[in-house]
Amino acid sequence: METQRASLSLGRRSLWLLLLGLVLASASAQALSYREAVLRAVDQLNEKSSEANLYRLLELDPPPKQDDENSNIPKPVSFRVKETVCPRTSQQPAEQCDFKENGLLKECVGTVTLDQVGNNFDITCAEPQSVRGLRRLGRKIAHGVKKYGPTVLRIIRIAG
């Protein structure tokens, strides 16, 4: 009788330990890695984009040092994406697309959560400052040539 109780008690403990192990395993399986969370955010950005081509992760800054391992708390991210040759309407995953030669580059910053269920992210992407400055300068030069070009040509003809 005593051995039956001990055996039954051991069986219950084993069952509880097994259940606890399953719960912990499923909880840890739901947490994404930092890189996986960023890739998911890039996919969401591509879905919401109105641009012609997909963007793909080019470079990911290292994750910040944080003591908090809670996957529901937003983590700061910083990364760069580059335009690919794949049209946005294609069903091909961006990670399988080649980068477009001279494709547009964007710097992205924001937050992601590592919770696999959630898909929570807040990301803003923009062209790097130097590229924007060069484009702006190019537009100003083109505008100046358009506006003052004929006058400059007349002066050159008169002087020459």
From Swiss-Prot:
Keyword terms: Antibiotic, Antimicrobial, Disulfide bond, Secreted, Signal
GO terms assigned for molecular function: lipopolysaccharide binding
Origin superkingdom: Eukaryota
Residues of the propeptide: 30-131
Cystine connections: 86-97, 108-125
GO cellular component term, pick one: extracellular space
Annotated compartments: Secreted
Key word Disulfide bond present: yes
Entries under SUPFAM superfamilies matching the protein: Cystatin/monellin (SSF54403)
GO biological process per UniProt: antibacterial innate immune response; antimicrobial humoral immune response mediated by antimicrobial peptide; defense response to Gram-negative bacterium; defense response to Gram-positive bacterium
Primary localization: secreted
Temperature sensitivity of activity: Thermostable.
Signal peptide span: 1-29
Pfam families according to UniProt: Cathelicidins
InterPro entries: Cathelicidin-like, Cathelicidin_CS, Cystatin_sf
Family named by the database record: Belongs to the cathelicidin family.
Function: Broad spectrum bactericidal agent.
Protein name, UniProt field: Cathelin-related peptide SC5
Organism encoding this protein: Ovis aries
Lineage: Eukaryota, Metazoa, Chordata, Craniata, Vertebrata
